[in-house]
């Protein structure tokens, strides 16, 4: 069953007194997309839409923060989320290459045990003449304390390959493919509860229910 709450996830998590969660799987605003303050302060449609046409998807908040503000926000939210999780729960968070150092700091400051970094290979994205193609995003994962080796969870890949969502299926500027989210959700215990503080297009919610 999907339960959707609209509001500041920090306020929600601070007051939540329901069942504990078995996994946190989420895709926060990256707050990167530029080398300078002016570039990072651009709208999300300017940063993440690879076309000169008007972007049909609305801009979203939280993507214009400086690095310290973003680190503080993420550490705060991940700490609040961990309190609402069972021991041994799993954390999975998307990011781009610029934010890996900050995100891994936030994960550990929040009390999670960092376990590794995964790769989403987007296949043919972002060609740049004279440079390596920026076709990957990254996923930091961790656990709330020990992670028993005998959990009823299969061996999962460390690299996920799928193109960006296109056409009529796309409803969000930074939407993650549901096929990838279905694979990632398998890290959660069968029948477990998954928390997504940054719901976005709802890919995690849809994948978790399948």
Residue ranges of model-derived segments:
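Core catalytic lobe of class I
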Residues: 1-210
